Amino acid sequence: MYAGVNGIQLYYQKTGRGRPLIMVHGNSEDHTIFDEAVNVLKDHFTCYAIDSRGHGQSSPCRELHYDDMAQDMIAFMTELDLENVVFYGFSDGGIVGLLAARQCRRITDLIVSGANLKPNGTKAWFRIMVAGMGLVKKDPLIELMQREPNIEPSELSSIKARTLVLAGSKDLIREAETRKIAESIPGAELRILDGESHGSYIVHSEKIAEILTEHLL
């Protein structure tokens, strides 16, 4: 299915019944990373697994910015008239969720995994790897990770949604960055998942579905 927002087409799959749950993937991925999780969540939620702009079956873009992606999600919720929304974002999707929840009161529960506030919120080895990729190939997805996000911790104080901040103990995001996010959102809960990496409990995994249902139901 497609929704027209901000002059582009966002592709999404709608599955299940119940409270709306928006799920947004990370950089260079698409909605299919959530297939296994949606299969579990569909009995409790209406899942909207979305391809963000420049990804999957959504409109391609020559240049990408997290703020634009966040505005897309806000417009998506408005277009479909979704209220009392659970927003789950992984990696880049988590960044988008933080930006959207600052101003969108349709989001009443926010769960983010492996998000960062600044490019240096990732570990040094990952930044070196991304820099090398940028030398080999000019790609808006790589450029996005190199120059963004640029979120000040103080900006997160406007988030009113009940928030759960997640990361793996072996995540490519620095733990100090994850803790800073949680500390900057009023009332946020923090969970560092022992033994998990950036996407091990999310990508084609039912583990994230178990975490979400435990937290929300």
Go through each PLM region and give its residues:
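Active-site loop/oxyanion-hole signature of alpha/beta-hydrolase fold enzymes
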Residues: 48-86, 210
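Conserved alpha/beta-hydrolase "acid-adjacent" motif
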Residues: 172-177
